[in-house]
């Protein structure tokens, strides 16, 4: 599977509107800018851009800040099975690649929503990426053909989360009170994250190590007239942009969560 279809999900829509591509990265501790190859619907992480441009061509310090508009934005309501699948994937974003036990049977009869909290971003201005590329871009192992066809991209901004909140709701005919549960009897995160009951309807999962990015801003790398171009904005089709012909942030797949593969361990 190369992506998860989530076109109607409220959180994915918020991320897309902010210019972010939702992603599932293979590991934690990664920082932008990084090179990606998008080929036949598969997004593969190549490695750090710094290894493919001259030393000193990129700024020494990343910009960073909070993403208040994304923090606490909820997903659409999910069934119990869909909630289990989403939580299993979302835990990877806070460093839990596999949970020894993830039993959500206590939520039977409820609908579930999720949100990320403590959302921050780190990245560079797209203009800095373009300037570095034109000082000399040499991505070893990527063919001229892939560059010519626009398959090469750079993630210049990553969004991270401190925690994932899971909230339960019912139609009124049933009552859910997670404070009355021994939550450790249902969920075991293998010591890689903390599970805290925040209220009668909300459980929070907080990672202990470095988080994985759960979304990124991408731009496309192309060569034109002996110069490199870095396109972080695009003119999208009718119905997507507020004004016809307006430039919007570059998105690989609207309404989808992209599953990232690693090409190499750098």
Curated annotation (Swiss-Prot):
One of its GO terms (cellular component) is plasma membrane. Residues 245-266 are annotated as: C-terminal region. Keywords: Antiviral defense, Cell inner membrane, Cell membrane, Cytoplasm, Lipoprotein, Membrane, Palmitate, Transmembrane, Transmembrane beta strand. Palmitoylation helps stabilize the inactive state; may self palmitoylate. Palmitoylation plays a significant role in pore formation. Its main location: membrane. A lipid is attached at residue 6 (S-palmitoyl cysteine). It is found in: Cell inner membrane. One of its GO terms (biological process) is defense response to virus. The chain crosses the membrane at residues 70-86, 99-117, 163-180, 189-205. The record marks 244-245 as: Cleavage. Signal peptide: none annotated. It is a multi-pass membrane protein. Belongs to the bacterial gasdermin family. The N-terminus has marked structural similarity to the mammalian gasdermin N-terminal domain. The C-terminal region wraps around the twisted beta sheet core, probably stabilizing the inactive state. This is Gasdermin bGSDM. It comes from Piscinibacter sakaiensis.
